[in-house]
Amino acid sequence: MQPGAALNLRLWLCLGLLQGLANGYSMTPPTLNITEDSYVIDTGDSLSISCRGQHPLEWTWPGAQEVLTTGGKDSEDTRVVHDCEGTEARPYCKVLLLAQTHANNTGSYHCYYKYIKARIEGTTAASTYVFVRDFKHPFINKPDTLLVNRKDSMWVPCLVSIPGLNITLRSQSSALHPDGQEVLWDDRRGMRVPTQLLRDALYLQCETTWGDQNFLSNLFVVHITGNELYDIQLYPKKSMELLVGEKLVLNCTVWAEFDSGVTFDWDYPGKQAERAKWVPERRSQQTHTELSSILTIHNVSQNDLGPYVCEANNGIQRFRESTEVIVHEKPFISVEWLKGPVLEATAGDELVKLPVKLAAYPPPEFQWYKDRKAVTGRHNPHALVLKEVTEASAGVYTLALWNSAAGLRQNISLELVVNVPPHIHEKEASSPSIYSRHSRQTLTCTAYGVPQPLSVQWHWRPWTPCKTFAQRSLRRRQQRDGMPQCRDWKEVTTQDAVNPIESLDSWTEFVEGKNKTVSKLVIQDANVSAMYKCVVVNKVGQDERLIYFYVTTIPDGFSIESEPSEDPLEGQSVRLSCRADNYTYEHLRWYRLNLSTLHDAQGNPLLLDCKNVHLFATPLEANLEEAEPGARHATLSLNIPRVAPEDEGDYVCEVQDRRSQDKHCHKKYLSVQALEAPRLTQNLTDLLVNVSDSLEMRCPVAGAHVPSIVWYKDERLLEKESGIDLADSNQRLSIQRVREEDAGRYLCSVCNAKGCVNSSASVAVEGSEDKGSMEIVILIGTGVIAVFFWVLLLLIFCNMKRPAHADIKTGYLSIIMDPGEVPLEEQCEYLSYDASQWEFPRERLHLGRVLGHGAFGKVVEASAFGINKGSSCDTVAVKMLKEGATASEHRALMSELKILIHIGNHLNVVNLLGACTKPNGPLMVIVEFCKYGNLSNFLRVKRDTFNPYAEKSPEQRRRFRAMVEGAKADRRRPGSSDRALFTRFLMGKGSARRAPLVQEAEDLWLSPLTMEDLVCYSFQVARGMEFLASRKCIHRDLAARNILLSESDIVKICDFGLARDIYKDPDYVRKGSARLPLKWMAPESIFDKVYTTQSDVWSFGVLLWEIFSLGASPYPGVQINEEFCQRLKDGTRMRAPELATPAIRHIMQSCWSGDPKARPAFSDLVEILGDLLQGGGWQEEEEERMALHSSQSSEEDGFMQASTTALHITEADADDSPPSMHCHSLAARYYNCVSFPGRLARGTKTPGSSRMKTFEELPMTPTTYKASMDNQTDSGMVLASEEFEELESRHRPEGSFSCKGPGQHMDIPRGHPDPQGRRRRPTQGAQGGKVFYNNEYGEVSQPCTEGDCCPSAGSTFFADSSY
């Protein structure tokens, strides 16, 4: 190294030290009790130096650098380093104590901070120089070699123990004295001499005089050296590990200029003990010199571990190299994860490393295993490297480490998870791109990846040109595999797909040893060409499959058709049409195969391929027909005007694929029938028949192509007419019931182009016509008797099949069951519960918010996983008891569950979905969830968006028509179940799932409310009530608050006693101990406690008023008191709402007839409202309504005074005259004159009844009542309990009262306790798409009528909250 380079190295080291000082060593330095720069004592004296500082301290002194001695004596000297008491500013203190000092103790004494590497005088260290004067031994240096190099001057280290001596430097030929200029003396370092003065010296020695005695130092042998050191290395290069007791050998080698001299110095732990030995070596090479120093320590111990530093110095350059020596007490193996137990890679990676953190000595043997199988090849114990990662690389890798000599063994396992980008397998195989129109097609995507793709997304786009690109790795793939660069892809749904979608399902399937995701898109009707793609994604990639879904009317895109379709007859015109899809094929050609060329010389048949068809066939001239506008196919027609036997043979149509350029062929064999003259296989024979018998004559013909067979009677052409039948291509003549005039000569004539053949026979008729008439009478009589017995047997059979009490089906609403023979509680015990059909696991039911709660029950919104037998999650409502419910309440809820099961499903009734009855949890009844809440609140919210005649979407109109047509179809089919409409509506929606899963066409909160909607709601409620009435179930609380609105404008009847407290509901008025919905109750229910289907019809009329007033409360402003009840009984009614059309007004008026028998049945209401809904004509109704509205204030409001006896139908009228509708009062186009009670006339037209009084025209007498919590109503008026008692006693017979329903009468003794049943209804609100619930319930008291369903005393009924 050049001198300039050495200078730069020194500057760099100085800057590094200053940088370290600036960065962290600006601190308070330690202080010594000896403040002098040098300190002089005499030999044999003791030396004590104390050092204090802010950090732990350590001492070094001559011959003991960096040796830590704490509180003990050295083996050679009597020096001691121990702790002393510090101060508050410098809490750490160390004292160095030397007893019996000698001259060799002369030198520099350093105190420094122990744990700070940088030793900077005045910053992290403090020192002083101590002279131990020995007048007998003033020189203390040892014999040494002095390397003389090219420096200007150098120090001769003649160290002295006495400062201030006069020193002379002598060589073999000269002596030098310090002159203060070129030759300098320093008591601490020796004498500095110019280098040129020493080049001729062989040795050097210092001389001094003390007293009268001369003293000489030890000799310095002078050695002239080279100037430059090249490199230094310490072997082993890495850290060295040993066990206690082993031998340490370190080799420090320097490469230097030829004939250079180097001084080695080792620095290592335990240097003071001088246990190490180092041996210098020198090897001269031709161009340089290698100098080494080998350090050896036998029987290493824990004290020998640490850094070992080798320093080489030639006087100009100083090289250092270090290594770390680790000494272990005993053999060990330690291994742990470096990046965790699970590592991930992706298939296709070039390599992956499985690293471990390993520490072991001695180095153990090792082996890598994969899934318990040894991994071959050379590997590293610190990391296993895998190249070209594939899915097969995944597994559990284990590193086994062992040291047999020490009996050590360790294992560690790592799991490698190889993520595989998803891949769709159908892309590997060719798939059809042509699909027949109106066919059912299934598109499949089977994907595999790691992790497994959770779902498959389907998209479609219209069949329009789209730019494509080819994937680089699949350049030769056909065009259909290129991915379109289009942005107009749409997600496939079952509603807005261009082709009707039957189903879209995805599932996991075990295929070829792997779990694969399979998705099938089933297209119900292929109508329109489109492009489909399926997309699968996981966390490391995605894959897509493009499907060109081209729809054509040609099967497989290529076909041959012939006219005529059967084998042609000689002489006929034949046309062979080759039809090919333009999108797929081009270059249509006709060939006729040459029979002579289809065999080789030996007569063996040749292999016929479409590619070489031209070698065996003759091309034919054909006509390419012009395609119709919009057609996507081409037709090449081969016409043969008059086919002959020689035209028989194979005809081939050849087409060429547009993309692959491959040729495809279809072959048609044309068979020609030779024309021959017709012949009869049997001649006609003469016949003798009786009058009224049947006659049959046959004219069987043999021979091909018989174009004409004609029959003659008495030379007159015989044609097919009543009683005469010609069949089997006119080969058979039949005459039913022969008459005398049918006698005569019959001729059969058969002709074709080759000629004609005839056959004739005579027919004679005998007997009289009267005999035939008698036979007719006998036949008719026999038929009548047979029909009579058939009807009788049918009635007997139906009576035997009448369901027993154990088979009673009833509603789950606020129903009354007939306890005439068996009490309700016993009936419920007879009902069974099929757990295999209805039990639903609780763990798949996630309960949500409480929709409503009452005194002992609550209704909760919940998510049910798989309740529709699929994998979807559906929102349901769950009824359950509150904590602390009694056993009777539990039995009541269980009884209601059984009733719900036996009543069955209906589209317009909230239906049961399942139940949780197992004893490991609460009893829960699961019913449908209706997202739009009750109808009353919905109508109120939609008032602002009411648009009577807004145009409905085609989908909504289709649903409306389906409802009406389904109801009429069920009516026409005797015995059809009410489930039919429910199922048919769901199928119309394109789904076969249960009612809760009907997909809604649009959000009802966003669409306007129309007059058509109001009629539709009314029709559906009537339909649901018809269903309940057919089950002999009475609702008793039919109101808009108990009608729920679901998706797709479907309304459902409900009544939720479990979740309502009617004691807090203003619509219920207290009557004695019961609360009653008086505004909705019929007069016979208020006064006589009679509840029948006819009383439900009255409530339906009030419900109509609510609907057409958009959710208003009935009888607005009317006080609900005794006067109200009396006037209601006397015939006063509500005025119709302004939105009600004349037809709706008449329906209301009929429902509010005072005579229950005069009210229409629900089946009549269904037909009337269905015709009204189906007929349309809303603008005409509006004009009629406006015209009526102008005169409503003084004339008919649609609600006139109707006496309970205003309608008179005599027995004669009832027997003689068919029922007819008063079409002058009801619009015929809506009603079609369908009759129902209350608007019938027999024979003659009955004049209209007198005008009905309304509450608006005749205000009630003002009465002030103090409102209380017991009897408040929504109008703010109440009817006191005492008034009810008075009103009831006033109209009750003295001994008993009569409860009449249609055709029934029941006398109940006075004082008979009223059976009570729980009553409940939901109160819901919806605003902004949310549903709010205010559910309450209570109790009512009522007797029941014969033939209808009534609960026994104490029976409790429950229904769903909001459903």
UniProtKB/Swiss-Prot annotation:
Keywords carried by this UniProt record: Angiogenesis, ATP-binding, Cell membrane, Cytoplasm, Disulfide bond, Glycoprotein, Immunoglobulin domain, Kinase, Membrane, Nucleotide-binding, Nucleus, Phosphoprotein, Receptor, Repeat, Signal, Transferase, Transmembrane, Transmembrane helix, Tyrosine-protein kinase
Record domain Ig-like C2-type: where: 44-118, 151-213, 230-326, 331-415, 422-552, 555-671, 678-764
InterPro entries on file: Ig-like_dom, Ig-like_dom_sf, Ig-like_fold, Ig_I-set, Ig_sub, Ig_sub2, Kinase-like_dom_sf, Prot_kinase_dom
Catalytic reactions of this protein: L-tyrosyl-[protein] + ATP = O-phospho-L-tyrosyl-[protein] + ADP + H(+)
Localisation per UniProt entry: Cell membrane; Cytoplasm; Nucleus
Annotated catalytic residues: D1037
Keyword Heme (UniProt): no
Segments on the Cytoplasmic face: 797-1363
Cystine bridges: C51-C111, C158-C206, C252-C310, C445-C534, C466-C486, C578-C653, C699-C751
Name assigned to this protein: Vascular endothelial growth factor receptor 3
Origin organism lineage: Eukaryota, Metazoa, Chordata, Craniata, Vertebrata
Gene name of the encoded protein: Flt4
